Regions:
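N-terminal small-residue-enriched
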Residues: 2-6, 10-506
Length: 506
């Protein structure tokens, strides 16, 4: 079977339990089955599952397509372990609730229909598929589904230190040592916590031309400090997140120093005087702008519902000519990366804005089909029992040519914003609001020592992007989670270089 190495982030291979506490059932079977075209059924030892899940799902798809023009099946299972250590002791628990299920989807010629089963039992899957087939009439053909080229492939996260190779007790002991390094006897500190969360996700997608499987390991390692000074709360926070192994599960001396420094500085922040400022965004704030401005606003399911003003600006200027913005699920090891989306499209970069021109929205299969546009690998779901939507992955501004020090030196009277908290956008009106961690006062290109928190930026998307006058040559991605409105959460990153612009801050 052919191998695929997408920026060295995923490789073909078998699966091992990343969490060491929650056994996901079919990893070895899935990846082994993905290496052959054989339709022969077999029993996977130790799973109680009779035969290849890939073969079962392929048979279901083939049967549904005797009536409908297009059918798919996707399997998702997640499980993991969380270890934490604070001043009260140590805790080991499941990381979230283990989940497992299959979604079966059909296109009747005019619209999509779907059913989901919280099981991988062949009997349950075939029964659900039969009911969907029986109760859904075949419609007249109004749209044509794009068939992707044939591909049968498996992937697995690249790791330098596989968590499965280190017993859970040894990992807990390492966390004890790190807690001792992070703990601080400053009387203002009330709580210190370090934690490691590891989640393994198995994913399968099957349609007539695709049999895809992946096993990914997501690790999040966090240090947190909280306390008070004269009634004012303060905190420090450092974390390493990505699709990787235990090589990420470590805070170095610089991380711990930054954790303590951020805690101390947060105790002396003041509210920012509201006004319009010349500003420089640190990469994580640039990413928040990217995510909220030309992330949600160009998810193309909003075009179908006529809920996105960006639809009026396709192939038109929306930003400074210095701005190029991308979404790329193939970035090596990033939290928002994946080998293929939940509709079988393999990962590749999508240029959303090029030299200030809005050139391509993010699509799922439904929006691309109904609007007749090029398809991007952005059809994503939160879990096996949720709908697929057009979603971001890793969304960021491309590097520019300016040294970040030049951006700061150019500020005669302004703010340097860093850290991020949250954001929201109105796709219909194209208003945006997001909150950074802190804003440092800058005069004459130098910090004055005044720190404001939390600064909130508001404005009209094309105006903020159009005001960008300098783009740094650095690049950083920050991990996060993204909801579709108030629900449908998926893993993402956002970032880019430093940016200089003008914005309303309060």
């Amino acid at each position: 079977m052919a191998t695929m190495n997408r920026r060295q982030f995923l490789i073909r291979g078998g699966a091992t339990l990343a969490g060491a506490a929650v056994a996901l059932p079919f990893a070895d079977t899935l990846l082994a089955a993905g290496r052959t075209n054989s339709a022969a059924h077999h029993t996977a030892a130790g799973t109680g599952f009779p035969g290849s899940l890939l073969d079962e799902l392929s048979a279901i798809v083939a049967d549904l397509e005797t009536k409908f023009p297009y059918a798919t099946a996707r399997f998702i299972a997640t499980g993991g372990v969380s270890i934490s250590r604070d001043r009260k002791g140590k805790r080991v628990s499941e990381s979230g609730s283990p989940t497992l299920g299959v979604s079966i989807r059909i296109f009747d010629g005019a619209s999509f229909h779907e059913t989901a089963v919280g099981s991988a039992s062949p009997q349950a899957l075939h029964a659900a598929a039969a009911a969907l087939k029986r109760t859904t009439p075949r419609a007249a053909d109004r749209y044509r589904i794009e068939r992707l080229p044939y591909l049968q492939q498996t992937w697995r996260t690249v790791m330098e230190r596989d968590p499965a190779a280190l017993p859970l007790a040894d990992r807990a002991a390492l966390l004890d040592q790190e807690f001792a390094r992070c703990n601080w006897d400053d009387p203002r500190v009330r709580s210190v916590r370090v934690s490691t969360d590891i989640v393994e996700t198995q994913r399968v997608f099957v349609d007539r031309t695709r049999r895809l499987a992946s096993v990914s390991t997501m690790l999040s390692h966090t240090g947190f400090m909280f306390g008070f000074d004269k009634g004012k709360p303060g905190f420090g926070f450092r974390r390493h997140v990505g699709q990787a192994g235990l090589e990420l599960a470590h805070l170095n001396d610089a991380d711990i120093e930054k954790l303590r420094k951020d805690f101390v500085e947060s105790l002396s922040t003041e509210p920012v005087p509201a006004g319009e400022y010349e500003v420089v965004f640190a990469p994580e704030v640039s990413g928040l702008l990217a995510h909220e401005s030309f992330g949600h606003g160009v998810e193309m399911d909003q075009f179908v519902k006529d809920r996105a003003k960006s639809r009026e600006f396709l192939n038109k200027p929306v930003a400074s000519k210095l701005v190029t913005l991308l979404d790329d699920p193939s970035v090596a090891g990033a939290r928002g990366s994946y080998a293929f989306d939940d509709e079988g499209a393999t990962s590749q970069p999508t240029i959303i804005i090029k030299d200030g021109i809005f050139v391509q929205p993010l699509t799922d299969l439904m929006s691309a089909t109904f609007l007749g546009t090029p398809r991007t690998p952005n059809g994503r779901t939160q879990s096996w029992d949720r709908k697929v939507y057009a979603r971001m992955s890793n969304t960021f501004f491309a590097r520019g040519t300016s040294d970040p020090k030049e951006l700061l030196a150019s500020l005669k009277d302004g703010l340097y914003l860093e850290g991020f908290r949250n954001g929201i956008e109105d796709p219909q009106g194209w208003g945006i609001q997001f909150t950074a961690g802190t804003a440092r006062e800058v005069k004459g290109g130098k910090f004055t020592g005044r720190i404001f928190a939390p600064p909130t930026i508001t404005g009209y998307v094309p105006e903020i992007l159009g005001n960008i006058t300098m783009v740094g040559n650095d690049f950083v991605l920050e991990p996060g989670s993204c909801g579709k409105g108030y629900k449908e959460f998926v893993a993402v990153t956002s970032g880019g270089p430093h940016l200089r612009t003008k914005a309303k801050v309060s």
